[in-house]
Design a protein with these regions (language model features):
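Helix-start (N-cap) detector for alpha-helical repeat units in TPR-like alpha-solenoids
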Residues: 21-23, 56-57, 90-94, 124-125, ...
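Register position in tetratricopeptide repeats
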Residues: 34-35, 68, 102, 136, ...
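N-terminal leader/linker segments that initiate helical-solenoid repeat arrays
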Residues: 16-73, 77, 84, 368-376, ...
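Eukaryotic alpha-helical solenoid repeat scaffolds
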Residues: 295, 299, 305-306, 312-315, ...
Length: 429
C-alpha cells in the first residue's frame, strides 16, 4: 500500500507537467503542419490526443496532415472523431468531404458540403467543391443550381463561369458554354484555363483558326501545359498544317514524355510526311505503354513494310488478325508482305481470304467483324467516314489512320484535380 502511494506521488508531477504542456505541444504540432512537415506534426498531435482525447482540434489538424500524405481513409476517420467532439466546425466537414472525394465517395462528400454550408452559407470553396461533386455524378442540373448560388455570392469568381461552361458542354449547349467562357476571359484575360476552355468549344464547332488563336494565348500564359499543345496540334492538323502540328506534339512530349496522344498522333503525322523510322519509334513507345493496342500495332506494321522490314510487318499484321479475324486490310497487307519474302503460298491464302470476304459482303453475308472492301482503293482499306479523328476508346480497326482525341472520361479527370480544401490549414494554423 505504501509503495502504491509513493508511486502515485512520484508520477503526479509528471502527469501535471504533461497536462500543462499540452498547449505547447499543440503549438509545435501546428507549426510543423504549417511548414508542411506532416509526419512530425502527426507525432505531436498524437501526444495531445493521448493527453486530452476529448479535444476536437488535434483530430482535425491530424486529418489535415493525413490528407496531405494521401491517407484519405485516415483523414476521414479523424474528421469523424473531430465532428463527434464538435459538430459545428466547418473545416472538419470540408476536409472530410475532400477525403471522401479522393475515395470516390461523392454522396458522402455532398452531404458534408451541404452540412457545412448551413453553418457558412457564403463559403466559396464549399460551393465550388459541391458543384464539382454534382458534376462528377453527372447531376448537371444540381451543379448549375450550385454555380448560380456561387455566382450570386461571388459574381467575379471566374472558376464558376468555367465550371458552368463545362456543364453546358456536357448538356450539348455550346452557345451558352461559349458565353460563359467569354465572360471568364473578359473578367481575367490572364487566366490560361479560360482561353483553353473556349478553344475546346471552337474545336467542337470546327472553328479551327479561332481555336488555334485561343490556344496561342493559353500557351503564352502557361507554357508548361502539355494539353494545350496537344489541342493546338489538333487545330493545326485540321488546317493541314502538319509540320506545325508535329512541332506541337514535340513540345507536348518535352513536357510530358509519356503522353499517349502525343506519341500516337505524332507517329501518324510522321508517317504522312514520310518520316517512317521516327514514326516507328513513336508507335514502339505507344506499344510499351499499351502492348495490346492493335491500331498502333497495325500502323507499325505498315511502316515496317514501308521500310523493308517485311518479317516485322508480317508479325504485326498477324497479331492484329488474331485479334480481329475479319479485318480485311490485315489479310491484304500481310499478303503483300509475304510476296516480298517469297512466301507465295501464304500470300495466296491471304488473298483467297480477302476474295471470300469480298464475295460474302456482296452476297449480304456478314462476318460478324469489321471487314473492309479492298476493291474500294485496292489496298485493303475501305472508304472511311469524313471524320478525321476518333476517340481513344474507339476499337473499330477501320479507324486506324485517324488522329486520336481524349475520351470524355479522361477529360473529366480535371474535375478531380480542381477540388479545393487542403489550403484550409493555413487559415487555422
Amino acid at each position: 500500500m505504501i509503495k502504491k502511494i509513493l508511486l502515485a506521488i512520484l508520477l503526479l508531477p509528471t502527469l501535471l507537467y504533461a497536462q500543462i504542456n499540452t498547449e505547447r505541444v499543440m503549438t509545435i504540432a501546428r507549426n510543423a503542419l504549417y511548414f508542411e512537415d506532416y509526419v512530425l506534426s502527426i507525432q505531436y498531435f498524437n501526444q495531445v490526443i493521448n493527453a486530452k482525447p476529448y479535444l476536437y482540434e488535434p483530430y482535425f489538424f491530424r486529418a489535415l496532415a493525413k490528407i496531405n500524405l494521401d491517407d484519405f481513409q485516415g483523414a476521414e476517420m479523424d474528421c469523424d472523431l473531430a465532428i463527434q467532439r464538435n459538430p459545428f466546425v466547418v473545416g472538419a466537414y470540408q476536409i472530410r468531404g475532400l477525403a471522401r472525394i479522393r475515395q470516390d465517395k461523392f454522396d458522402g462528400a455532398i452531404e458534408d458540403y451541404k452540412t457545412a454550408l448551413k453553418y457558412d452559407p457564403e463559403n466559396v470553396v464549399l460551393w465550388h467543391n459541391l458543384s464539382l461533386c454534382h458534376m462528377q455524378k453527372e447531376d448537371f442540373s444540381s451543379a448549375k443550381e450550385d454555380l448560380g448560388k456561387l455566382l450570386a455570392i461571388a459574381p467575379r469568381y471566374t472558376r464558376a463561369y468555367l465550371m458552368r461552361g463545362e456543364v453546358n458542354l456536357k448538356q450539348n449547349d455550346t452557345i451558352q458554354a461559349l458565353k460563359d467562357f467569354d465572360t471568364a476571359i473578359d473578367m481575367d484575360r490572364y487566366d490560361p484555363d479560360s482561353w483553353a476552355a473556349r478553344a475546346i468549344v471552337r474545336l467542337q464547332q470546327a472553328d479551327y483558326k479561332e481555336a488555334e488563336s485561343d490556344l496561342d494565348q493559353a500557351i503564352h500564359l502557361s507554357v508548361r501545359n502539355s494539353g494545350n499543345y496537344i489541342n493546338r496540334a489538333l487545330a493545326r492538323f485540321h488546317q493541314n498544317n502538319l509540320r506545325g502540328a508535329m512541332s506541337d506534339y514535340d513540345l507536348a512530349l518535352d513536357i510530358d514524355p509519356n503522353n499517349f496522344l502525343g506519341h500516337y498522333n505524332r507517329g501518324l503525322l510522321r508517317a504522312q510526311v514520310g518520316d517512317d523510322n521516327r514514326a516507328i519509334e513513336d508507335f514502339d513507345f505507344v506499344l510499351k505503354i499499351e502492348p495490346d493496342n492493335m491500331m498502333a500495332t497495325f500502323n507499325r506494321g505498315l511502316l515496317r513494310a514501308q521500310t523493308g522490314d517485311y518479317r516485322g510487318a508480317i508479325s504485326d499484321y498477324s497479331r492484329v488478325i488474331d485479334e480481329y479475324p475479319n479485318f480485311m486490310a490485315g489479310y491484304y497487307h500481310r499478303a503483300e508482305a509475304r510476296k516480298k519474302i517469297g512466301d507465295r503460298k501464304g500470300a495466296e491464302q491471304d488473298e483467297f481470304k480477302v476474295m471470300k470476304m469480298q464475295l460474302d459482303k456482296r452476297n449480304g453475308v456478314t462476318s460478324g467483324g469489321n471487314g473492309k472492301d479492298v476493291a474500294d482503293n485496292n489496298n485493303g482499306d475501305s472508304g472511311q467516314d469524313s471524320s478525321k479523328t476518333r476517340k481513344k476508346s474507339d476499337k473499330n480497326m477501320e479507324n486506324y489512320r485517324k488522329i486520336v482525341i481524349a475520351d470524355d472520361s479522361e477529360a473529366d479527370q480535371r474535375y478531380k484535380s480542381d477540388y479545393r480544401g487542403r489550403e484550409i490549414g493555413r487559415a487555422h494554423v
